[in-house]
Amino acid sequence: MSIATVAKSIIQSINGGDSLTTVSLPASSFNVDCIKLVSVLLGKKLGGVYVTTSRPSSHIIAELEAAKADLSDLYFVDLVSMTVGGDTNDPRTLFIESPTMLESVLLNISLLERRLKAKKRFVVFDSVNGLNIYSEPKVLKEFINVLGNSMRIKELYSMLLTVKEQTDDELAAA
């Protein structure tokens, strides 16, 4: 399935009132597909929060800027930069010290979603596989459940991105 088809399906899902989806992307094009997907959503005037567990937000911002995406209503929760020593000066990014701090992820999403101007809004996790490295499966399932319920109440569409080849049955079932 092409990323354009995936994006179209997600937009239809958002317009239909759905609140949560898991999108499984191939490892060979994962980063490129994430950028394309978020660019399409921003192009449709959705606002969003991008939670990155696999790469520093500064890299993602640079790639989105290169793709000419409008970043005026996009914010980041970065679980990587403080761990690897990346740039932590971006005003639209909240940095978390460790990917194990799942409660902080929810708190920071809540803080950032208040800044969103768009009527239709999303939160995207790049990727859930990154969280799987740091958290026990049971804890991660509970987190995904709380996240889904919290975002539904806030009317934020949640996309959990996974790397197809790295997603086991237990994570896929979460």
Please give the residue ranges for each predicted region.
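Glycine-rich P-loop/Walker A and Walker A-like loops and their local beta1-loop-alpha1 context
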Residues: 2-63
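Conserved beta-strand segments of the P-loop GTPase G domain that flank and frequently precede/overlap
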Residues: 21-26, 50-52, 77-79, 96-97, ...
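Glycine-rich, charge-decorated loop segments at or immediately adjacent to ligand/cofactor-binding or catalytic sites
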Residues: 58-64, 160-174
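Long, charge-dense
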Residues: 60, 64-103
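Phosphate-binding/switch loop-helix module in NTP-utilizing enzymes
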Residues: 85-146
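Substrate-engagement module of ASCE P-loop NTPases
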Residues: 135, 139-166
